[in-house]
Amino acid sequence: MVHKDDPSPDIAARTLAALLRDIVASGRKPIEPPDISDAAAVHDLRKALKRWRAILRLIAPLVGDEAELMRVEARNLAREMAAARDGQAALEAIADLSDAGDSLPKLSARSRAVIAERLAEMGAGAQAIGLSPARRTRLGDMWSRAAAAVERWPLERFDRSQAAEQLTVFYRRVCAAVPDDWSHASPEALHRFRQRVVEHRYQMELADPLWPKLMHVWVSEAQRLRDRLGAHHDLVILQRLTEPHQPLARWRSQLELLIAERQTAHVAAAKRLTGRLFAEKSKAFRQRLASLWEHRAQRRD
């Protein structure tokens, strides 16, 4: 904790503390009001958990083992709720196919309605399980401990030099995950890259005060890339549901080609976005961030 006689924390420390408090508040909100739908609660919780995990990775050198333990706990809770997302992901994949031009020409209106109904039933059941009373209690306990930890951690020691260094570490990490050959990238490789993009997108919120307009564009482009890769992954989930003995097996022949064509379009768009976002070498990225942090600190001082 910083006392009144202590010097004001670095701009990076103040930004980090505010960001962590915002994440904790956003994670508590979906499990408190009784009138929020399970689908909306799962969506908001998954987002908060992703933000929390991304920043915990960033500050692990400062906080130590506790950050890693809390990150693993959040990851495990997110995985437990993953099944609650599959039905919704497949529904979004069907909508994506419908938005891609000539909708689903090989499927009758009746077939589309049955598919949507089955997926909705899957999603509703999984969401109810995903947010059981016991899991809500565990989530509430986790966020309470997180709130206490944020006030206890020595965040005032985090300075702009560390911010630039740590953001660069994970920028390098996402660059290393870029597929070498996009045309032959496996769903697993694209999913790993998407995970790194999500991590980077949320970590870059720390840099927002440096140049808000630029960072807004950067985060927006990262979100667009994430959305493209996410849509590709939704189609992977839909494809799995058409395999033998799965809920949509009877429509496999009609959906298979449509899924493949749409995935190709998403990969092409993701490749273009990646070329813009991650063209800069990590050394240049760090130098630019360091200069922006220094300029922002001097302007305040």
Predicted regions and their residues:
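Function-determining surface determinants
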Residues: 1-301
